[in-house]
């Protein structure tokens, strides 16, 4: 029986939601992950340090008994964000990053930034105090094809911002294109990228071939196969600029299976099994720890976890529930469309 022991991983991009959904999904993360950067796009969003403090308390209260898990809180950037509040949040140790959502780019992003100039006082303060900016890297202008949103964002928004504020530390979250990978590789400093589990596995065919498959629909949307292969190469390379951010995003089935379904894929429960499969398939099991457990902490200035987990490769396939039940409703679990043989021990 093959075994692989690695430092306990972290998730550098996670949606826990709130209320009954939070209570229903948090255990799938805290079972395997020590820390996670928590997305602030609630309704209403987490825009102040006081909001983040209250949300963190709700997360900790929802943790299953005995689980050790540290939520790393973020603030939702608006055109009215108070730079002093952001700085206080960082000084207190509460705030790990600030999240930029272009208005309308994804779930609950309508209160996001429309004019980046109006957010510059906060961004300048962040650059000064060394607080990272996490970006949803897509433009939302209607004339841009949805499959080109990331590349156009890099050219028209991100690169001008980084030239204007070269000392600002930026995380390109959920990179989905070779353009994004190449841009990160070309940067001399202050740029890194998170990659999701599902974007390593699916391309856009998964959503569209054989019928509309809403449980593979996410934002940024999965791209063509050449982009998926570029993501795989980056993730399995050991390059310290790339790390795991699952973007696990639960929605109840009625909100996915409808005429205008929500974007989001729920992967927290089986991410480590999926990743072990991917890295084994690419002959890179020795790089899994860097991607899931080492590169992220190094980027965010944190120590790696001392605790270890062990992955076991089983002869028989490992089964996960097709759906989970939460107090908010039924959530469909990501199906990688191949059998999984790696399991987390215990």
From Swiss-Prot:
Keywords: Hydrolase, Metal-binding, Pyrimidine biosynthesis, Zinc. Pathway: Pyrimidine metabolism; UMP biosynthesis via de novo pathway; (S)-dihydroorotate from bicarbonate: step 3/3. The active site is at residue 247. Substrate binds at residues 15-17, 41, 136, 219, 251, 263. Zn(2+) 1 binds at residues 13, 15, 99, 247. SUPFAM superfamilies: Metallo-dependent hydrolases (SSF51556). Its cofactor is Zn(2+). InterPro entries: Amidohydro-rel (IPR006680), DHOdimr (IPR004721), Dihydroorotase_CS (IPR002195), Metal_Hydrolase (IPR032466). CDD domains: DHOase. Binds 2 Zn(2+) ions per subunit. One of its GO terms (biological process) is 'de novo' pyrimidine nucleobase biosynthetic process. Pfam families: Amidohydro_1 (PF01979). GO terms for molecular function: dihydroorotase activity; zinc ion binding. HAMAP family: PyrC_classII (MF_00219). Catalyzes the reversible cyclization of carbamoyl aspartate to dihydroorotate. Homodimer. NCBIfam families: pyrC_dimer. This is Dihydroorotase. It comes from Rhizobium rhizogenes (strain K84 / ATCC BAA-868).
